[in-house]
């Protein structure tokens, strides 16, 4: 990528802001090495990584990188046999811990969101090795302050125990010296000199006190003397300390060797964690600047919607909407300086650099960007967003360098093209340069204040004029980009509002040609027309948004109604189920009492009639529920013949079938109307009459007794619903008659009646077993039932 373009578009400042989002110096190093990619597939992959990181941040948070430092040099030293210090070993343990935490974080994320797909991040995290043994070994041996702990080895524990014992003996002896020779001492304290216990003795008692002098005070009045009584014990302490140091050195060497043995894995861990920190920083920066993922295309098409320059504060920035590379390949922004033209160029250039670096861009949805091999920018030397200090020479030197490289895969940005020289020559040069760049197929955006270029967009195919809006009332620019409208100088209007006399302004107008005045007038009208159009567009968008919100509110209300309906149905079903269970228990109680009376031989006719009446009263809801459940399970939709009389249950009217439609519905003539009705909303008139007659009969089912232990029910030619009602009554009477086995003849046919009978029997608690008939019993056209 062109170095000058990176400089003038302030790419380094972008990297500084991005580096602030990293959690480690390693992540910041990745940011500092970041460069825009020039390959389309590579840019796609970079954006995919940012998208996955954004998803992770949205669902949970950033990865836990605590303790991540660059330990690669320490690992290399360990590999060649060097002994690492305790702080260096702790840094290694921290890196291992960080990797383990990131892996655990990713695993929990997938557990919480089983359908989540993060292929790019997962492939990187899979490379991290947990290295639990390394981490545990270091933590077991070294505490958080970097001290080797007693638990590091049995030998170290024993040596330190010996040290504590010896130090206790020395202190005990010195305490005696402090008591017995207190007048010789400058102070009654014990101090350490050269790792030996000493006491402060006055200079004049040097000979009387004895012992070994190790130090003296700055004034020389006090000597720090090791009492003779503790010399031997101090020697033992020194020997023990030497052994302690040797054991600590051995432990550190052992841990360092362990680190060196997994050097490759540790380096991979560091590299992966650093890259993850860098990727997550992109997601966090995008969140900070309210960025969106842009669409990516391969046709060098730029579409910015409400784009904002990321360095300008939100309360100051004015979003721009601009398209380049579709209908128009060149954009020429005209008008006076200080109107925001340079900011527009920098916004286009910097957002293109951002997307090619895998960053989201601060813009609205539907923003679209492409991938360019090179971006060239001539925005002057040392120019900031607020200033333009370039000269003609510096401009032209840069342009000459650019022109030797520009091709159809380039994005070119010219600021104040042709400025700094004679206006006529400068304008002519600007037009020639724009024509040449356009001829090469590059995408170009240029700014100029030359009025000669106002007509350029109208005279060249693929070129569009634009200008920065200026508020004449407030005498200040609005920084809004107006596409399709060339810029005006507004010099006369501004001068008039500032108080210049009308006759002076009129004289100035006379100096300007009629054609130039006409052009300015035309531009003014274009600006007004565009503002009216934009105002109308905003109103339409607001109305559209209102309609969308109303529709969403309507859909929410519909969903609430549907949910309420389902809750009511669920409660009703629960209530019906309880009623069925209650009826079942009542029926069982009646049957049990009848059996007890029959077995006792004490049943009388009027008692039997009364018990049967109770059974019939308890039965209907249970019977209806059983039939409904079996009907639902068999999925047996009623079939109607053409001309058959039916009842439309939805509005309780009779009619007759005209025909059946391809979607399964029936066309029914009801009075003077023809209606299309679902089969489930139709009932046979004969069936309704039959049902009403059945209710009036209490014992209409006939049981043919074949022997003392069998009975038979013939259901051939009967519809499923009617047959199940008969079977229900038949079962009750069979139980009252104390039958042990019964037969139900349902025939073969379509199998619907057989399936219905099987479903009914599976839900009946009085049935011990049931099976299809065997050879000589009627085969599959008969069901044999044994009762409990």
Swiss-Prot record:
One of its GO terms (biological process) is rescue of stalled ribosome. Residues 688-708 are annotated as: Disordered. ATP binds at residues 335-342. Its EC number is 3.1.-.-, 3.6.4.-. Endonuclease that is involved in the suppression of homologous recombination and thus may have a key role in the control of bacterial genetic diversity. Acts as a ribosome collision sensor, splitting the ribosome into its 2 subunits. Detects stalled/collided 70S ribosomes which it binds and splits by an ATP-hydrolysis driven conformational change. Acts upstream of the ribosome quality control system (RQC), a ribosome-associated complex that mediates the extraction of incompletely synthesized nascent chains from stalled ribosomes and their subsequent degradation. Probably generates substrates for RQC. HAMAP family: MutS2. This is Endonuclease MutS2. It comes from Exiguobacterium sibiricum (strain DSM 17290 / CCUG 55495 / CIP 109462 / JCM 13490 / 255-15). The lineage of its organism: Bacteria, Bacillati, Bacillota, Bacilli, Bacillales.
């Amino acid at each position: 990528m062109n170095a000058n373009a990176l400089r003038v578009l302030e790419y380094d400042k972008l990297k500084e802001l991005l580096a602030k989002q990293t959690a480690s110096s390693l992540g910041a190093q990745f940011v500092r090495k970041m460069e825009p990619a020039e390959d389309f597939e590579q840019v796609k992959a970079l954006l995919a990584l940012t998208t996955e990181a954004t998803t992770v941040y949205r669902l949970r948070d950033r990865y836990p990188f605590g303790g991540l430092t660059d330990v690669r040099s320490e690992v290399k030293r360990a590999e060649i046999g060097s002994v690492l210090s305790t702080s260096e070993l702790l840094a290694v343990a921290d890196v291992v811990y960080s990797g383990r935490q990131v892996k655990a974080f990713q695993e929990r994320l997938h557990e919480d969101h089983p359908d989540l797909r993060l292929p790019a991040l997962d492939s990187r995290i899979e490379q991290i090795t947990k290295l639990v043994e390394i981490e545990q070994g270091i933590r077991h041996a070294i505490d958080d302050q970097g001290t080797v702990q007693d638990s590091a080895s049995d030998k170290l524990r024993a040596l330190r125990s010996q040290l504590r014992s010896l130090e206790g003996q020395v202190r005990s002896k010195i305490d005696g010296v402090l008591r017995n020779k207190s007048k010789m001492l400058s102070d009654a304290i014990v101090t350490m000199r050269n790792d030996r216990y000493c006491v402060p003795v006055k200079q004049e008692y040097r000979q009387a006190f004895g012992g070994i002098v190790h130090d003296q005070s700055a004034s020389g009045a006090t000597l720090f003397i090791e009492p003779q009584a503790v010399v031997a014990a101090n020697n033992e302490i020194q020997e023990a300390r030497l052994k302690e140091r040797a054991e600590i050195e051995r432990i550190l060497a052992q841990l360092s060797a362990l680190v060196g043995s997994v050097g490759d894995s540790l380096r991979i861990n560091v590299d992966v964690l650093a890259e993850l920190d860098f990727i997550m920083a992109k997601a966090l920066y995008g969140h900070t600047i309210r960025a969106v993922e842009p669409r990516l295309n391969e046709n060098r098409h730029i579409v910015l919607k409400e784009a904002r320059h990321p360095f300008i504060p939100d309360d100051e920035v004015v979003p721009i909407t601009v398209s380049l590379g579709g209908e128009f390949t060149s954009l020429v922004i005209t008008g006076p300086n200080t109107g925001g033209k340079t900011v527009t160029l920098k916004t286009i250039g910097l957002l293109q650099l951002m997307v090619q670096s895998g960053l989201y861009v601060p813009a609205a949805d539907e923003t679209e960007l492409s991938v360019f091999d090179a971006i060239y920018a001539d925005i002057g030397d040392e120019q900031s967003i607020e200033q333009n200090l370039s000269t003609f020479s510096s401009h032209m030197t840069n342009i000459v360098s650019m022109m030797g490289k520009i091709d159809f895969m380039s994005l070119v940005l010219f600021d104040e093209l042709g400025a700094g020289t004679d206006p006529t020559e400068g304008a002519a040069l600007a037009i020639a340069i724009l024509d040449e760049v356009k001829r090469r197929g590059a995408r170009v955006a240029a700014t100029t204040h030359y009025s000669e270029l106002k007509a350029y967009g109208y005279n060249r195919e693929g070129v569009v004029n634009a200008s920065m809006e200026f508020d004449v009332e407030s005498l200040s620019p609005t920084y809004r980009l107006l596409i399709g409208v060339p810029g005006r100088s507004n010099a006369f209007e501004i001068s008039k509002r500032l108080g210049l006399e009308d006759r002076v302004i009129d004289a100035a107008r006379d100096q300007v040609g009629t054609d130039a005045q006409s052009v300015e007038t035309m531009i003014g009208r274009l600006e007004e027309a565009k503002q009216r159009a934009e105002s109308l567009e905003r109103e339409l968008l607001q109305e559209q948004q209102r309609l969308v919100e109303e529709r969403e509110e309507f859909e929410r209300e519909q969903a609430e109604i549907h949910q309420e309906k389902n809750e009511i149905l669920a409660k009703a079903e629960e209530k019906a189920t309880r009623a069925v269970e209650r009826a079942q228990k009542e029926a069982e109680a009646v049957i049990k009492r009848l059996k007890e009376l029959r077995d006792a031989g004490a049943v009388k006719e009027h008692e039997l009639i009364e018990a049967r009446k109770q059974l019939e009263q308890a039965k209907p809801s249970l019977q209806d529920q059983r039939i409904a459940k079996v009907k639902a399970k068999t999925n047996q939709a009623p079939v109607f013949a053409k001309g058959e009389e039916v009842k439309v249950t939805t509005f309780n009217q009779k009619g007759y079938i005209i025909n059946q439609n391809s979607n399964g519905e029936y066309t029914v003539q009801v009075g003077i109307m023809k209606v299309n009705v679902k089969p489930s909303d139709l009932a046979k008139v004969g069936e309704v009459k039959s049902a009403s007659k059945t209710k009036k009969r209490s014992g209409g089912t006939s049981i043919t007794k074949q022997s003392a232990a069998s009975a038979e029910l013939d259901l051939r030619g009967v519809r499923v619903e009617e047959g199940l009602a008969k079977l229900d009554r038949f079962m009750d009477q069979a139980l009252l008659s104390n039958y042990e086995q019964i037969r139900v003849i349902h025939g073969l046919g379509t199998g619907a009646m057989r399936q219905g009978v099987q479903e009914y029997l599976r839900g009946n608690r009085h049935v011990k077993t049931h099976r299809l008939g065997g050879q000589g019993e009627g085969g599959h056209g008969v069901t044999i039932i044994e009762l409990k």
